[in-house]
Structure formats: structure tokens, C-alpha cells
Amino acid sequence: MGNELDTSHDRQEMIGIGRRKLLKLTGAGAAAAGIMTLAARPAFAQYTGTWDKTFAPSERVEHRKVTYVNRLGINLVADMYVPKNLDISRRHPALIVGHPYGGVKEQTSGLYAQTMAERGFVTIAHDASYNGESGGQPHFISSPEAVIEDFSAGVDFLGLDPRVDRNRIGVIGVCASGGFALAAAQIDPRMKAVATVSMYDMGGAKWAWKGETMQADAQTDLLNKIGEQRWAEAGGAPKQYLALPEALTPETDAITREFFDYYRTPRGAHPRATTAMNISGDPSYLHFRPFDHVDMISPRPVLLIAGENAHSRFFSEQAIAKAAEPKELFIVSGAGHVDLYDKVDLIPWDKLKSFFDQHLSA
């Protein structure tokens, strides 16, 4: 078991230095339209017991903040949600919920974790390594190895909880965490069922949007620019980050506007969800292809949920084509990509519950 979080860190300032796009890709470039620099230390918050989520607390669920360490030695911070009046004389199914790229556990993944706890599951929503309240330095980077490992670390943690049946642990990944969850389940058979929502394949988003791989010369040019930036940073220059812009312009594309409406408005904004990611991490996604071996998850089940109108729907369609049975693609009528982050009247809660009830049964 982990411990209650009792750590404080300095707050840092974030400074925008322009809105030009570094990446020329329709998807990842649109979702990360600003270039930013950050001061030396990441922003953290001390846990005081005050509710700090973008959604209301449930009277049917007990919440506490926990910490545990992944295989890479990174301290992960998670919110744990447990149904009230849980029968502790028996063990229960559990779920690990991963947040979207650039998000934090106080947003979408926390909403999913709390809502599934209302439906009888023990759940955790963690901050990915190098993000939110979790450890890892420097902050605001994304490593495929680390974020995949974070899911397995969640299985480690839940499997030691006396209330949890370690043979009945499932995973929900939203947006980029959907791709990470599929990759994690391929190599960790302890994850007995996997559901994704509005899934993104970050390797495809950054380097092969809709299957159209970046031209070799453009790819080489971008890698060279990132290499030069690494030398600059090693010599003391400010780090460069991609993030959503702080304001919209008439030229802002539709995908960026969709993300902006969540991350940059009271709807979903959170002080630790900067959306910023250090550009030096992008080359690590060049060979990240979570669908190539998705059939390895079988005979464990996969449920892929996508909005009918989601710009990301094709990722789920690509994955379902390569997955082996049992598998299901569930399309939410009238929903877009970000709609399934927080619009509780559109999120198919009953579908998620029935899926995990069936496949995490005793």
C-alpha cells in the first residue's frame, strides 16, 4: 500500500513565447499549438484535503490521495476512489484510469474513476510520470516507457490492497492513455480487461497522422531541429514546450478549438494541467506503435469507445481492425472527441460497467 501524500513543492511561472507550430502534423500539431518556456521547477500542490477536481465529489464514494513507486523509481501520485460501505469480507474488482496527454488526474480520469467507483469498483486515477503531482525530473515530458510502466505500477499497488482481487484488475485509458493502456496490456497479463475512450495513438498523432507518414525529409529536418534544441538546453538555454495556446485567433483550427474549450475554460481547466510537453521527447514516439501487437492482448477483452463525430475515431477503427477477439468498437452517437472527457450524459457508463462486470467477474 502507498501513503497519504504529504509533500510540498515550489510553484513555478510559465511564460508563453509565441504560437508558431513546431510540428506540421494536422493532429499533434493542432493539439499542441503553442511554444512555451518554463522556469526550472515544475508546479506542484500540497495535499490539504481540499477538493481540487474539475468535477463534484460523490457522496457515494470515499476518496483519498495515495502514492506508490513505479519500476523506474518514479513516485506516482494517485487519487483512490472506493465505494462507501464496501464489504471488506470479500475482495472486489478494481480499475486503473489514465488521463489524456497533458492532462492530470483531477480532470477526466478522476471523473471516470469516481463514477466507476459509484458502480462498485475500487479505482485509482494517477498522474503520469513527469506530470501533475507525480515525480520524475525534469517535469512536463512524456516517455512511452514511463507512461506504460505507470499502468503496471498501478496493478502492483492495487494487487497489494486487501480489498482488491488481484485477478480482477482492469484498465481504462482516455485519449492518449488509451494507446498507452493497450501497449501496457500487451506486456502485462495481469490487466484482465482494457477499455479505451476517445483513444489517441501518440506515435501516429506525432509522426503518421491518419496513416500518412511524415515525409522523410521533413522527419529528418524535425529531428535535426530537436537535436539542436537539446544541445542548446544542455548549454543552459530555456527548454521549449508545445502546449495549447492561451487564446484563440481566427486562424485557430477546429481540433485546437475543441481542446481549448476544455483545457482553457472553467469547464476543465486545472492549474497543474498546463498541456505543455517538452519537445525533446517527441523522437521517442517515432517508433511507438501500440496497435502493431494489439492482438497479443487476446484472449483478454478489449472495448474501444469513440464518438461518432470524433476527429480521433480513426485510431479506434485502426486498433479494432488489428485486435483479436474478444473485441468491440462502441460508437457514441452524436459525440465528438472531447465530449467524452466530461459530458456525463454522453459517456456510456452502462456500457463500461457491463463490460467490466462481465470480464472482471469472480
Residue spans for each PLM region:
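N-terminal cap/lid segment of alpha/beta-hydrolase-fold proteins
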Residues: 49-90
